[in-house]
Regions:
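Alpha-helical transmembrane segments of integral membrane proteins, especially early/N-terminal helices
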Residues: 37-46, 82, 111-123
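Core segments of transmembrane alpha-helices
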Residues: 120-132, 192-195
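Cytosolic-biased juxtamembrane loops and peripheral soluble domains of multi-pass membrane proteins
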Residues: 91-120, 176-178
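Short loop-to-helix capping motifs
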Residues: 21, 35, 124-125, 180
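Hydrophobic/aromatic residues within the transmembrane alpha-helices of Major Facilitator Superfamily
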Residues: 14, 18, 51-52, 88, ...
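Juxtamembrane transmembrane-helix termini in multi-pass membrane transport proteins
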Residues: 3-73, 131-152, 156-157, 168-169
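Short alpha-helical transmembrane interface motifs in multi-pass membrane proteins
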Residues: 7-12, 81-84, 115-119, 155-156
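Selective transmembrane alpha-helices of multi-pass membrane proteins
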Residues: 67-98, 157-170, 175-208
Length: 208
């Protein structure tokens, strides 16, 4: 792969990953409510899902998925429903105090955080269309596809994980301030509203 090709790809990925979305908000809110470790687990769940989408798109399977109206709608409606559910949970949340959890509860929480991140990361079917359209612009058919995949995927993972970690740390750093009287409730209302809005917007998405 030529250096200029990688630079152009990196710029495209930088713009993509720097744009805040549901996964960023989820890591932020998890950092506020549960601390850095669970927020990082959430980030890894989201990263796993998006990396799978990237892989499917790179191998050409993304074209098959993106061309199926049925599959697109299934992903869309499941993702929208889950985002709206997260919003409702945020509205109902009363996280005004913390308590220590035993190891079993912590283990369960990490599993739940990973699954939550994975679902949100995979909730937008347009990601498949985006990557499917992106890769042909940069793939060199005369070079090793495996090497190119490793470079493309590695670059994406570094940037995506960096941004999600940033939002997780931001949540941790602002948690004390947010959990002062009245602010936690406002934060829950704001995040709940954003999740619900994202779910509603996703439900109206189409493949075009």
């Amino acid at each position: 792969m030529q250096l200029d090709t990688w630079i152009y790809y990196t710029l495209a990925i930088l713009v993509l990953t720097a744009s805040p979305g549901p996964s960023s908000l989820l890591c932020l809110s998890k950092g506020v409510s549960s601390g850095f470790r669970l927020a990082l687990t959430t980030a890894l769940g989201s990263l796993s899902a998006i990396t799978i989408i990237l892989t499917l798109s790179f191998t050409g399977l993304g074209v098959v998925i993106a061309s199926s109206e049925f599959v697109f709608n299934i992903i869309k409606w499941c993702g929208a429903a889950y985002l709206i559910w997260l919003g409702i949970q945020a509205f109902r949340s009363k996280q005004n105090d913390f308590s220590k959890s035993d190891s079993a509860q912590v283990s369960t929480s990490h599993v739940s955080a990973y699954i939550s991140g994975f679902i949100v990361g995979s909730s937008n079917p347009k990601a498949i269309i985006f990557f499917t359209a992106l890769f042909p612009q940069f793939i060199d058919p005369t070079a090793s596809l495996l090497t190119q995949y490793a470079i493309f995927a590695g670059t994406f993972v570094v940037f995506e994980l960096s941004w999600l970690t940033f939002y997780a740390l931001l949540g941790v750093k602002t948690s004390n301030w947010l959990f002062e009287a009245g602010r936690a409730k406002l934060f829950n209302r704001l995040t709940g509203g954003v999740f619900i809005s994202a779910g509603v917007m996703l439900s109206t998405a189409n493949r075009s």
